[in-house]
Amino acid sequence: MKYKVEIVIDEEKVINDDIYEPSEMYEFIRNMFKRFDLAEIKTDKPYHLIFADKGRNRDYGALGKSMLDLYYSDWFLKYAKKLFWHNNVNESVEDVLNQLGNKT
């Protein structure tokens, strides 16, 4: 595994806003990465999601596309607490919300 995308959703805000069902939101996020057959690394919290490459040449682009599709969706930034891009090749972690700007 060379690359990972890590997402943390503010579940309390999702519940308090009462616009989206948290479980449906998490399933939507999962499906964004499943469409490219990317691996999900299970965590002990439903609002903490991690997706990784499977070592295929196309996975880098698929991870990036899925992450940016979420970033530019109309609801994601309102509820995202963390969005990290992990690069195990050069051992770096990028805070995407700070790099691109959290527009909420």
Tell what function each PLM region has:
Residues 31-52:
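Short, glycine- and small/hydrophobic-rich beta-strand elements in well-ordered beta-sheets
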Residues 1-13, 97-104:
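Charged, low-complexity, helix/coiled-coil-prone segments
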Residues 7-11, 49-57:
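Short beta-strand-to-loop capping motifs
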Residues 2-6, 50, 82-84:
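Ordered hydrophobic segments in well-structured contexts
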Residues 3-7, 13-26, 30-32:
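Long, contiguous binding/interaction regions
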Residues 17, 21, 43, 55:
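Conserved aromatic-histidine-acidic binding/catalytic patches
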Residues 54-104:
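Long, continuous compositionally biased terminal/linker segments
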